[in-house]
């Protein structure tokens, strides 16, 4: 993992008053997903909480807020397998990567920014849980009031899939439809739109999604059991 902050802690970037000298090289963002194991198994909700805590507090310590915002957007794009967008965000903000990962980055002033690995990919021992959201999910509206439209979702494998959806549909219902079409367990699916994670109870109409927009689906398939 190179210089990545692989433990569940993060090293603070160099303070702006004492910028570290930026590395002389800048490598393109690598497409390979970083693999790591948490010190303790965590649920998807716990992972989201840790990420929110980091992104909410990191700009308060040091560095420039616009750079943190760009790094957050690039991290979400990379995790959604849209590396072209992630690289464009980094280039637009003049962020350099000495090692080709978001673990260590520099802005044009030479300030260093370090992202913890849990902000870049989920751990291999992530607990896949069935939340109460599924059992509390509102019933589907009667077929007579459904106005269906093709919904395009892009899997983290790079494959595009079209689902038959309507605005009152919940993400949980669409996860099950994707499971029926592609055989991907709902508990393996994490849906993102505009950089935000969509919960199972979120209805499409709440996302303000428009025609031809794409929802990113990250697949966290558990590794096969080792003999």
From Swiss-Prot:
SMART domains with a match to the protein in the record: UBQ
A Pfam family annotated for this UniProt entry: ubiquitin
Regulation: induction: Induced by cytotoxic agents, it is also increased during premature senescence. the induction seems to be mediated by TP53.
Domain Ubiquitin-like residues, every copy: 149-224
Stretches the record annotates as Disordered: 1-35
CDD domains tied to this protein: Ubl_UBTD1
Gene3D superfamilies the record matches: Phosphatidylinositol 3-kinase Catalytic Subunit, Chain A, domain 1 (3.10.20.90), Ub domain-containing protein, DC-UbP/UBTD2, N-terminal domain (1.20.225.20)
Lineage: superkingdom: Eukaryota
Regions of compositional bias (Basic and acidic residues) in chain numbering: 24-35
Oligomeric form and interacting partners: Interacts with UBTD1.
Function per UniProt: May be involved in the regulation of cellular senescence through a positive feedback loop with TP53. Is a TP53 downstream target gene that increases the stability of TP53 protein by promoting the ubiquitination and degradation of MDM2.
Name listed for the protein in its UniProt record: Ubiquitin domain-containing protein 1
């Amino acid at each position: 993992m190179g210089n990545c902050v692989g433990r569940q802690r993060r090293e603070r970037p160099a303070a702006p008053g004492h910028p570290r000298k930026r590395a002389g090289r800048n490598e393109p963002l690598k497409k390979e997903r970083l693999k790591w194991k948490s010190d303790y198994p965590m649920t998807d909700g716990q992972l989201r909480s840790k990420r929110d805590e980091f992104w909410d507090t990191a700009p308060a310590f040091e560095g420039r807020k616009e750079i943190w915002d760009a790094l957050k957007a690039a991290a979400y794009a990379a995790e959604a397998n849209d590396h072209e967008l992630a690289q464009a965000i980094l280039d637009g903000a003049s962020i350099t990567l000495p090692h080709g990962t978001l673990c260590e980055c520099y802005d044009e002033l030479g300030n260093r920014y370090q992202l913890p690995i849990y902000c870049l990919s989920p751990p291999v021992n992530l607990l896949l849980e069935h939340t109460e959201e599924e059992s509390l999910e509102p019933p589907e509206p009667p077929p007579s009031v459904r106005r269906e439209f093709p919904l395009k979702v892009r899997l983290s494998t790079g494959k595009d899939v079209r689902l038959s959806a309507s605005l009152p549909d919940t993400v949980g219902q669409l996860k099950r439809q994707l499971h029926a079409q592609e055989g991907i367990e709902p508990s393996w699916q994490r849906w993102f739109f505009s950089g935000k994670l969509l919960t199972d109870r979120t209805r499409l109409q709440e996302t303000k999604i428009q025609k031809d927009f794409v929802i990113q689906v990250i697949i966290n398939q558990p590794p096969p059991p080792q003999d």
